[in-house]
Amino acid sequence: MVEAGKLGSDFEAMTVPEAELKRTDAGLIPQGEGWFVLNARDASWIRSEDRGQDTDFEGRQEWTDLGFRIQILSPGQRGLYHGERGQEDFLVVSGECVLVIEGEERNLKAWDFVHCPPWTKHTFIGTGDGPCVIVMAGSRAGGFEVVYAVDDAAAKHGASVLEETSSPDEAYSRFGEEKRSAYSEGWLPS
């Protein structure tokens, strides 16, 4: 740990610029590196009929250290069973979902937290009678790497690939197209 005042004049003279937020029909999209403040309701979202919708806080840049998003799953919407190179953590903020993790099912509700060390295979499926909101964070240290795995428990929910792959495009090829969208009222809790 570096003590305060020990970084010297280089740190004191350094400033991190504010990133531009570009307004589009689908919401605000960060442009370039730098800090920014962006309300999730103003952000651009990525939607799929099968996979739900999630925030696009990164824009076209891919953050190198940490991925962060809010995903909303309506009942029956789901991701695909997979494991990633980096640690991932999830917090269910509202609603209900089923977590398939290492071949086992767990029912989750608001304020349940899930910790996945690297390569923990998992996916979420929306359940209940309304949307499920999940805050997701994942390490990108060492680069992004993913494997979509075949799993019987995930297959019961339509959330398993038919053949193992490390290609997101290949894994999700049977799902509907993703499109950018502006926030719709009611997606997030008040």
Regions found by a protein language model. Name each.
Residues 1-65, 156-190:
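A short, N-terminal "cap"/entry segment at the start of jelly-roll beta-barrel domains
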Residues 48-56, 69-84, 118:
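Conserved short histidine dyad/triad with adjacent acidic residue
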Residues 65-75, 83-100, 138-139:
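Short, conserved beta-strand element in jelly-roll/cupin
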Residues 77, 85-86, 104, 120-121, ...:
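A generic "binding-loop/recognition-motif" signal
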Residues 89, 103-119:
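Short acidic-glycine-tyrosine-enriched beta hairpin
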Residues 98, 118-144:
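Ligand-binding loop in jelly-roll beta-barrel domains
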Residues 134, 138-142, 146, 150-151, ...:
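Extended, acidic-biased charged interface segments
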